[in-house]
Amino acid sequence: CVNCRPTCAITTGFSGAGAFSDGKLSLSYEVGGDLPTLIGEEFAQELIDYTDKIYLEFGADPHVEGIYTGEDIKEIRKNAIHAGLKLVDCPIRHLGTEKAQELYLAIQNYLADNGVEMRFNTECENIILEEEGCKGVLLKDGDSLLPVYADEVVIGTGRRGADWLEKLCAEHHIAHKPGTVDIGVRVECRNEVMEKVNKVLYESKLIGYPKPWKNKVRTFCQNPGGFVAQENYDNDLAVVNGHSFKEKKSENTNLAILVSHNFTEPFNQPIAYAQKVGELTNMLGAGHIMVQRYGDILDGKRTWAKELAQSNVKPTLKDAVAGDITAAMPYRAMTNIIEFIKMLDMVVPGFAANETLLYSPELKFYSNKVKMDSNLDTNIKGLHCLGDSSGWTRGLMMASVMGVLMGRKLAEKEGC
């Protein structure tokens, strides 16, 4: 990695990682985080339907994936139940990576044309607190700090800023609690293996609790004909992700398998824990994403580049380093992943093939959950938090919904 664009910029800027994701909009309140528990399931679904119309107005594809019924989906669900997995129904509106960038640029231009001032390449150092509450933010301006005052301050830093927000909460006693952090791998196999699931569901959302620990393990971000990608976070932390284009396709399907981790006491720094797992994996891969064949993991051996070259499954992340991801992945997480893959093989025969590829690390930094009420107010007057960094959402649609709700609440305060 030579820190080139867009690879190292895909988690920042307008719409954050959303513009460089493959743009999957989950159209069910059951997917995308815990916001429905805060505002109610029925209201959450109403907001999803409203927000979806906005996406359509800005050019989203009217076609919806995963709305098929009939014998095929019954068979998939039957196999999932037999395997001990729960299949979550969720229609998907797929933008595609290239279309997502166009759509979010259109939204950005619309906001700019309507008088919204945006500052890019600007670091927020801190918030301004007075006795009455939050009164603004401090921006870095060269060697000095520039105060920007406001009646209401909204923090929406995305997954990239989750660690920053956690430190801010600790410094200013913003009520929060350690949430869940997800540690896992990006799995890649041939399209032929996933053909039925891809056709019927497009994205299969499966949840299981494999023995012996029965931690929650789930599939996430499935990309038929997609590509595995690298994201770079602060401190040169390289993590793996996946995306798919609307037009350009590969011969493979990739998806994440994520193991949920919850910590209480004496340790309560889940983000730091996940970062250490990522740093250790990066060290073994000399700064690159590591990839290993599933069969080699079971055989207790590393994967070599020449073995990848001879495999049916060719890595779509070309600079991934063949090696041994088990040397860095915690035993509990690795065991959960292996057992979950065995369960998935009962739903998708061939998924647990020897040549199936596992890339590491895949980490989701939405751990810190800021305590808020249904009006999205924190314990500090005038301060609000949104999106994945708040700990309440996990994905494009639910984060967008939270933004819509926040906009309505602010408009109400202004008497609009």
Enumerate the language-model features and the residues they cover.
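Residues forming the flavin
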Residues: 1-39, 65-416
